[in-house]
Amino acid sequence: MEDRYLYTTAVPILLGGGRLAGKTAQYLYGHYGLEVRWLGDTWHPLLAIYAKRLASLPLTEENDATVTRHLLALAEGYRRSVGIPAIIPCSPEAEAYLTRAEDTLEEEFVLLPLPDLTQSPLRGLLRREDTP
């Protein structure tokens, strides 16, 4: 069962790029009408339609500090809003980055797993709400 309110207050931030990011952005816009943000360097046509690009940065260890700065600056804007900023990795590189930066980001964002699109990419929000 979905909690539509929880899903529609999410602020999805896609990390990575390519086809999975494009399909995830399309899913989130189509199912929930969500404005999706995207940070990555691999373009896909669906991203141009369904996502607002934050920055074009490769997700390499050398860029970790820059990517983290971009994300934390974005989090500043959501501190006083009702939105729930949620990072969704869309590539193996994005998953690896989140593993490296988890301690820094987990206070500001909900960190979700790589989506498979057979279920909502935001399903992890429900599990997060159940934890103390």
Where are these regions (language model features)?
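Active-site nucleotide/adenylate-binding loops and adjacent lid/helix of ATP-dependent enzymes
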Residues: P121-P132
